[in-house]
Amino acid sequence: MAYQVLVICVVSSIVFAYIVWRKERKKKLPPSPKGLPIIGHLHLVSPIPHQDFYKLSLRHGPIMQLFLGSVPCVVASTAEAAKEFLKTHEINFSNRPGQNVAVQFLTYVFGPYGPSVKFIKKLCMSELLGGRMLDQFLPVRQQETKKFIKRVLQKGIAGEAVDFGGEFMRLSNNIISRMTMNQTSSEDEKQAEEMRMLVADVAELMGTFNVSDFIWFLKPFDLQGFNKRIRKTRIRFDAVLDRIIKQREEERRNNKEIGGTRQFKDILDVLLDIGEDDSSEIKLTKENIKAFIMDIFVAGTDTSAATMEWAMAELINNPCVLEKARQEIDAVVGNSRIIEESDIVNLPYLQAIVRETLRIHPGGPLIVRESSKSVVVCGYEIPAKTRLFVNVWAIGRDPNHWENPFEFRPERFFENGQSQLDVRGQHYHFIPFGSGRRSCPGTSLALQIVHVNLAIMIQCFQWKFDNGNNKVDMEEKSGITLPRAHPIICVPVPRLNPFPVM
């Protein structure tokens, strides 16, 4: 019986694909490589899709069509193509595809564009991640940075190796934890580790290829155990955040009973205030609040940590760049104190290093959207419900905009007007944080974390490797962000003597 059902499904899929093919061939569609029945072009795409899309675009052009199973897709691989989709036709491509993970966790980052997403974006820019809130949390970032330095320094004195990625992830997670829920991971290491693992699992699920998302007749079957993993992760997610929110609600009730107020409001307090405000533009439920907290952890922790790790990898492999950055920091800051956020504005070469890192290793290598209706883009007909991939990774390697694009050379940002390039999506050949109404609302926070902590690694330490050649591997692995395939592990050697008192 099961065999007969499978045969019927396969035959139906072939017939359906043929009908669609006959219908679509009459339209002027983007160029496309040859596909196969049922799977379309899935065989051409690996777990690191941005690399495969880039190679295919060299043959088929800046706008190409793919069928990932039964899902029609279009890939934009140049700045000009990206501008057409993200600016000229922005409204039509404001939705994001409703994948199973996004549905289960009700995320705003990966959900469809609508009133709730608009409200949260406005709230982020004005309140949650705006300038006033970032200024309020400056002492938090400073405290966590000092703890980070002390951990690395202690390992250096003991001659122990440091895992860059692990330390950067812990730092980012601690900052986000305290900004969001005013909790320090050192105060409750068990809960902090639970949260770190939960964030890592959700990020992995969001970046994992699930065949049932792409081949329609497999949707009822959980062939990879993917749905089971989502359900188990969701249970853990609910348990952790329900406990945190319940505890905070009790604290707020107790404060009201004694006539007091919380002098220091974190992001959770702001969200709960809105949830209790009957006049609010959008009524936030507890599920909405949990979804936003998960978004800020996944988006804020992973990307900042990965960017710092890639930057250190590039500096280690380019010692002349590292030395030039060190000289700039020594000239501006000196050796008697540790660099602070207020120093960054006076360190243009450091800023160029971060920009160059984001060009080659963008935190989100693909911008994923979905068309809400049929539209003509650059003369090509793009049907409704077509999944859009803007290949940010490929755009950063386009020789039409970047001279010697595979070379790590921060000096390029002082040449040919490139110093005016902004990371916030106004220049489409440099969009590491996306562009338009669905760009990353946490850009300012991410840049603050990355700049100052990268500068501290340059100023305070030199690095000793066991591999003998002082070079690190630059291989990527699959993920929703851009993780490294191999960790950077080396022994920190304190550079400042005496080391400044913290």
UniProtKB/Swiss-Prot annotation:
It is an enzyme of class 1 (oxidoreductase). One of its GO terms (cellular component) is membrane. CDD domains: CYP93. Transmembrane segments: none annotated. GO terms for molecular function: heme binding; iron ion binding; oxidoreductase activity, acting on paired donors, with incorporation or reduction of molecular oxygen, NAD(P)H as one donor, and incorporation of one atom of oxygen. Keywords: Heme, Iron, Membrane, Metal-binding, Monooxygenase, Oxidoreductase. It is found in: Membrane. Induction: By methyl jasmonate (meJA). Its EC number is 1.14.-.-. Its cofactor is heme. Heme binds at residue 440. Coiled coil: none annotated. It comes from the Eukaryota. Belongs to the cytochrome P450 family. This is Cytochrome P450 93A2. The lineage of its organism: Eukaryota, Viridiplantae, Streptophyta, Embryophyta, Tracheophyta.
